[in-house]
Amino acid sequence: MGSSPILLVLAISIGLASACFLNSCPYRRYGRTIRCSSCGIENEGVCISEGRCCTNEECFMSTECSYSAVCPELFCKIGHHPGYCMKKGYCCTQGGCQTSAMC
């Protein structure tokens, strides 16, 4: 019985270690059919349009994103601002990113 809590903690740790984030998942995980280029500090974002990089927290201008590296496939809106679905339920616009039922 003493090993049950240890096994539970081990299983949770493995689950968390194998989780992926916006740019660390295999590119087909979110329905994308092209590989997106990484951008931003520590390559934590993806190029959503030419000259535009989005991370989990914000979108910004970036010279790292060329036309051949962009990844917009699913479009969404937050208010009146157009954006891109970065993952299921998550929309990024020029003003930032937030949850969205459109994605």
From Swiss-Prot:
Residues 1-19 form the signal peptide. Disruption phenotype: Viable and fertile. Gustatory associative learning in response to salt cues is disrupted. Males have reduced reproductive success, due to a range of aberrant mating behaviors. This is Nematocin. GO terms for molecular function: neurohypophyseal hormone activity. Disulfide bonds join 20-25. Keywords: Amidation, Behavior, Disulfide bond, Neuropeptide, Secreted, Signal. Transmembrane segments: none annotated. It is found in: Secreted. InterPro entries: Neurhyp_horm. It comes from Caenorhabditis elegans. GO terms for biological process: neuropeptide signaling pathway. Detected in thermosensory AFD neurons, neurosecretory NSM cells, AVK interneurons, pharyngeal neuron M5, and the mechanosensory DVA neuron. Detected in male-specific CP motor neurons. The gene is ntc-1. Belongs to the vasopressin/oxytocin family. Its main location: secreted. The modification Tyrosine amide is found at residue 30. Residues 31-103 form a propeptide. Ligand for the G-protein coupled receptor ntr-1. Plays a role in gustatory associative learning. Also plays a role in male mating behavior. GO terms for cellular component: extracellular region.
